[in-house]
Amino acid sequence: MDASRYSYTSPEASHTHAYLWEPTLQVLLSSFGNSQPRRVFDLGCGSGAFANKLAAQGFEVHGVDPSLSGIEIARKAYPEISFDVGSTEEDLAGRFGKFQAVTSLEVVEHVYAPRQFAARVFDLLEPGRIAVISTPYHGYWKNLAIALLNKSDWHHTALWDNGHIKFWSTKTLGQLLAEAGFQDVKFLRVGRIPPLAKSMIAIARKPK
């Protein structure tokens, strides 16, 4: 998958931000407390809507995405925030440095090389800091409901250009993050009641 081909037309937030924003913000606020500065790396920032929300809350945000159209829109809409074209195929920490938190919302389901993705996230963090990674939730009861309602072809469609190529569970995403060196991996399920959640948010800490 060539993620640079992702096309964006608007800086507005996607529908997923409606249910991801508040729990993600609360996780970050709890992690930072009163410490300053509050530097966040938004990996897979798209057209910048989530980075802009973070900046409005006082975070110093650097957004990176492989989509040139997304970054061009983000720079135009939110000129006070730093945005760059980049991907986990390169040494992001070597290029941009270390951060107090890394966010990556609804990205990991799109990547071909998830272990490389997790390693890049790990490298971007200062010791003792957290990554916040969201992805569509897939669990037993939700998958059963999808099958019983005959929605599998819609939910797992193969016809979406540049669509989801990985379907994560808490077990597999937790394993990915643990293999990368993260500790204290926890999950939140958001968007609906937990068994039918739209997405899950992994909070993982880099050891001190």
Q: Where are each of the predicted segments found?
A:
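Conserved N-terminal segment of class I S-adenosyl-L-methionine
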Residues: 1-101, 105, 114-118, 133-138, ...
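Feature marks short, surface-exposed loop/turn motifs that line or immediately flank catalytic pockets
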Residues: 128, 139-141
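Catalytic P-loop NTPase motifs of RecA-like helicase/translocase cores
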Residues: 111
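A short glycine-rich, Lys/Arg-flanked "PGG" loop and its adjoining helix->strand segment in the class I
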Residues: 118-130
